[in-house]
Amino acid sequence: MSGSNGLFNPTADITRAQLVTTLYRLAGEPAVTDKSALTDFSDVAEGKYYTDAVCWAYAEGVTTGTDGKFNPTDKLTRQQMAAFFFRYAEVMDMDTSARGDYSSMVNADKLSSYAKEPMAWAVGAGLISGSDVTVNGVAAKDLNPRGNTTRAQVATILMRFCAE
C-alpha cells in the first residue's frame, strides 16, 4: 500500500479500486490479457491507475461488480473487503477452509448473503475480529459489515493475511 503526497492517511476510507490495486500488486502485477472488464463495466476505462488491476481481478473472479459497474471510487465496506480477500485467497490456491462464528457480534444480521461465507472465513482465519463497542453497558464486538473500511484497517488485515 502506498499513500499520496507523502502521507499514508490511515484514517481515510479506502475505495474499491484501491483495494483491488493492492491485491493486484500483492499477486505480483501479473500480465493482463483479458480486458473484458473494460466492456463489462461501464465505469472502468483505459489509462486509470486501477485499470489493469480491475481487469485482472475481474478475469480471475476476485470481483464481479454490480449491475454492469465496478464502482471504483465507491468506499469499500467491510463485507466487500472480506469478499475480495476470500476470492483472492481462492485464486491464489490458499487454504480457505477456516470458518468462524460471527453471529454474536453486533450488526451481524446486516451482513449481505454474498458475504456470509467470506466473512465466516475472515473471522475464522483471524483477519477480522470486530470493533470494540459497548452495548447497554456490556463490552461487545461490532462486525459492522456495511461500514466503510479505513486504510489502517486494510493494512492490518493485509498483514494478518500475509502472515497466514
Language-model regions: role of each:
Residues 1-20, 24-51, 60-79, 88-116, ...:
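Feature responds to low-complexity, polar/acidic, surface-exposed segments characteristic
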